[in-house]
Amino acid sequence: INWLKLGKAVIDAL
């Protein structure tokens, strides 16, 4: 799992 991409996706969803 790519945590940086996942984190960016979460931030973009906010």
Swiss-Prot record:
Residues with PTM Leucine amide: 14
Source species, domain of life: Eukaryota
Subcellular location(s) per record: Secreted; Target cell membrane
Gene Ontology CC annotation, any one: other organism cell membrane
Keywords: Amidation, G-protein coupled receptor impairing toxin, Mast cell degranulation, Membrane, Secreted, Target cell membrane, Target membrane, Toxin
Primary localization class, coarse: secreted
Keyword Hydrolase: no
Tissue: Expressed by the venom gland.
Main function: Mast cell degranulating peptide. Activates G proteins (Gi component), which in turn activates the cascade of molecular events cAMP-regulated, resulting in mast cell degranulation.
GO molecular function: toxin activity
UniProt record similarity statement: Belongs to the MCD family. Mastoparan subfamily.
The protein's name: Protopolybia-mastoparan-III
Disulfide partners: none
Pfam families, alphabetized: Mastoparan_2
